[in-house]
Amino acid sequence: MANSFVRYTGDGNTTQFSITFDYIETAHVACTVDGVSTTFTLSSGGTVATLSSAPALGASVEFRRTTSQSARLTDYQAGSVLKESDLDTDSQQAFFMGQEAIDNAGDAIQISSTNFQWDALNKRITNVADPTSAQDVATKNYLE
């Protein structure tokens, strides 16, 4: 089960989608419909996302958390009071980045533990170039 994203398939009618993961800031949540960045609004305490129009039937809808990796959300100052909320934010940022890394790795092509061959996990592989060497993978287009 993913901890940092949720995926839906558009039905041409639904505009509201549940956000089933936690996040620190709303800016850390993004939505794509068929891979195109899409704007949305959050309601119900940030657990429901609403799109302005319903994704088409069969469209791939993804809401994904991307916690800031380039900027620390907590800055500790020497001599300042150490607050629980600062510790929680700092810990949560690191925890969320770990979850996101694990989720991203779960979507990657992996080596099978049974035969040490690449395993696409029953997903299509797209955007493959035509082969140029004898042992390259051949695309359907190349073979037709």
Residue ranges and their predicted role:
Residues 1-93, 100, 104-108, 121, ...:
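N-terminal assembly/attachment segments of tailed bacteriophage virion structural proteins
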Residues 107-116:
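Polybasic "coupling" helices that flank or enter modular domains
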Residues 120-132:
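Right-handed beta-helix
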Residues 114, 121-124, 139:
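Cysteine-rich, disulfide-stabilized extracellular repeat modules
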